[in-house]
């Protein structure tokens, strides 16, 4: 537990050092609650629920519900919001998705990691990928082979079929392997997207169709993922790298510094349904102000991007 707390503190300090004052974290422990409270950061902490065996879903939900209630009592404040999240789609029985939505009951924010990698896509749609090679070993004692696979549909349609989008405040993380039909479904359900492009690039997961999301008028924010998946939680590096990745893919030169900055500020606020409180410097909003020092030699000349 102390290692989790120390890790959360370090991650929070690194985020603050690059100007991040609000974080969204998916976790199975309360370490992030303690750490962000200690650091005075604004946060949405999602309690993750995971169970591959249908027989363990109710137990997993009861455990998560107990943690949510405990965290709300201990940490709930204007700075800290508690939510709930389904585990990775390749490690969850689909009943988890509908149970999470039922429990949230349009009052708790929901997060999910979806369509992150080609391996996940193939596992869900075709039942064949590196995940399927090890699934018997990974889930021995629960189920030998997930009986619902292959589904023949994309991860987004899979989630849709199980009611995973039937809530008012959903944050979908990654959304890399998404087709036009998937995008329309995400937009129709007003699902917010958190793109984590450095993580996707470092792990060879692919490139999200960011420009398509923006053109569709969807709520999109920038995420850094965690230091376990990227070298840092520096939002300035995330903005610059993300823009260059999209340009290199030929997905639109309209992405400029202003667009990326907007996604890192107001975009993130909208994705978390906090645009009335944070994301811009306006009368009536919280004064989460970041000062950027441009006096260093590495900032001369200042480039754009």
Language-model segments: residues:
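Divalent metal-coordination and catalytic microenvironments
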Residues: 19, 36, 84, 113, ...
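Long hydrophobic segments that form regular secondary structure
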Residues: 178-191, 196-202
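Hydrophobic residues within beta-strands of alpha/beta enzymes
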Residues: 23-24, 110, 221-222
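Metal-coordinating catalytic core of metallo-dependent amide/deamination hydrolases
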Residues: 33-173
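His/Asp/Glu-enriched, well-ordered alpha-helical/loop segment
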Residues: 161-167, 211-296
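Histidine/acidic-residue-rich catalytic or RNA/ligand-binding cores of hydrolases
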Residues: 118-132, 183-187, 204-213, 230-245, ...
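Glycine-enriched alpha-helix->loop->beta-strand junction motifs that scaffold or abut catalytic
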Residues: 40-43, 101-109, 164-168, 185-194, ...
């Amino acid at each position: 537990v102390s290692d989790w707390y120390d890790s959360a503190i370090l991650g929070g300090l690194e985020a603050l050092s690059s100007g991040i004052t609000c974080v969204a974290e998916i976790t199975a422990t309360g370490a992030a609650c303690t750490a962000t409270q200690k650091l005075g950061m604004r946060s949405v902490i999602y309690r993750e629920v995971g169970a591959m065996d249908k027989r363990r879903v109710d137990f997993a939900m009861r455990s998560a519900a107990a943690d949510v209630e405990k965290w709300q009592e201990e940490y709930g404040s204007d700075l800290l919001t508690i939510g709930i999240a389904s585990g990775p789609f390749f490690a969850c029985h689909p009943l988890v998705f509908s149970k999470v939505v039922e429990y949230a009951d349009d009052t708790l924010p929901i997060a999910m990691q979806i369509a992150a990698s080609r391996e996940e896509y193939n596992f869900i749609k075709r039942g064949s990928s590196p995940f399927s090679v090890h699934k018997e070993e990974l889930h021995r004692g629960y189920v030998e082979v997930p009986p619902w696979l292959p589904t023949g549909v994309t991860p987004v349609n899979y989630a849709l079929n199980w009611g995973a989008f039937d809530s008012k405040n959903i944050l979908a993380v990654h959304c890399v392997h998404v087709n036009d039909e998937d995008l329309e479904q995400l937009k129709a359900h007003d699902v917010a997207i958190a793109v984590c492009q450095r993580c996707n690039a470092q792990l060879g997961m692919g490139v999200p169709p960011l420009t398509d999301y923006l053109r569709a008028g969807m709520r999109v924010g920038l995420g850094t993922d965690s230091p376990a998946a990227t070298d840092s939680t520096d939002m300035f590096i995330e903005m610059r790298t993300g823009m260059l990745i999209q340009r290199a893919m030929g997905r639109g030169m309209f992405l400029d510094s202003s667009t990326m900055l907007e996604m890192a500020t107001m975009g993130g606020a909208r994705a978390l349904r906090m645009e009335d409180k944070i994301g811009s410097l306006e009368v009536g909003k919280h004064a989460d102000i970041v000062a950027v020092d441009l006096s260093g030699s590495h900032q001369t000349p200042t480039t754009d991007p």
